[in-house]
């Protein structure tokens, strides 16, 4: 069993959903991102979705775009991200770790090497948000060779062919989006029609469904699970908390103003979001 299959099996036995926070590696600083990750795990996060900073994050809204810049301004690289992942895996050997990384990173490092490096660091899954499933063949092959679960996005208004491809080729979980567009709480998630989104994806079978994009409140999490999803992913709402405790304007390196206050607020937020999965 993989870490994902163990997780979803254990949660199902408890009649719980999964809460998965998204965190940008190296943002606002490497040390702060590690402290944030330790905090979300202590608060009850079931798995992690980690970002590798990239200079042109087209699938992300303004909040997460700024987190890419904060990490880059503090010197984050793919290699430094891999080092952080190795540390996280050492501390949390059973925790599923998923990555959200732009496809250009894979091309730059070489697709086979890219997947093997992240597998060796302890990663369970990789989602390339700018690579649709119809273009996924070389990535799927390299991921499977390295023992990584390839994840694809199931868009809210996807064609049947796309949904069938996502269900067929995603393992670990399926990232279903509650609405089309970019990530972020700048456009709040509408929970109306979530059951139709989930049912549409489920028609083709496949891995458990996690809902994302605009999930920012416990009510959103409850609605996602009530709609039939196995859990929810939250990124921009958590990133906004981090941003409120950060100084510095791009391209100046950012700093955390009060790490204790930041981690306390994050702990409370994640605890409430996880409670909504029960």
Curated annotation (Swiss-Prot):
Q: List the coiled-coil residues.
A: none
Q: What InterPro entries is this protein classified in?
A: Aldolase_TIM, RibuloseP-bd_barrel, Trp_synthase_alpha_AS, Trp_synthase_suA
Q: Name one GO cellular component term.
A: cytosol
**Any one GO molecular function term:** tryptophan synthase activity
**Catalytic activity line of the entry:** (1S,2R)-1-C-(indol-3-yl)glycerol 3-phosphate + L-serine = D-glyceraldehyde 3-phosphate + L-tryptophan + H2O
Keyword Amino-acid biosynthesis set for record: yes
Q: In which pathway does it act?
A: Amino-acid biosynthesis; L-tryptophan biosynthesis; L-tryptophan from chorismate: step 5/5
Where is the catalytic site? 49 (proton acceptor), 60 (proton acceptor)
What domain of life does the native source organism fall in? Bacteria
Q: What is its EC number?
A: 4.2.1.20
Q: Keywords in UniProt for this one?
A: Amino-acid biosynthesis, Aromatic amino acid biosynthesis, Lyase, Tryptophan biosynthesis
Q: What class of enzyme is it?
A: lyase
Identify its protein family. Belongs to the TrpA family.
Describe the function of this protein: The alpha subunit is responsible for the aldol cleavage of indoleglycerol phosphate to indole and glyceraldehyde 3-phosphate.
Assembly and oligomerization: Tetramer of two alpha and two beta chains.
PANTHER family the record matches:
TRYPTOPHAN SYNTHASE ALPHA CHAIN, CHLOROPLASTIC (PTHR43406:SF1), TRYPTOPHAN SYNTHASE, ALPHA CHAIN (PTHR43406)
Task: Please state what the protein is called.
Answer: Tryptophan synthase alpha chain
Species per Swiss-Prot/TrEMBL record: Corynebacterium diphtheriae (strain ATCC 700971 / NCTC 13129 / Biotype gravis)
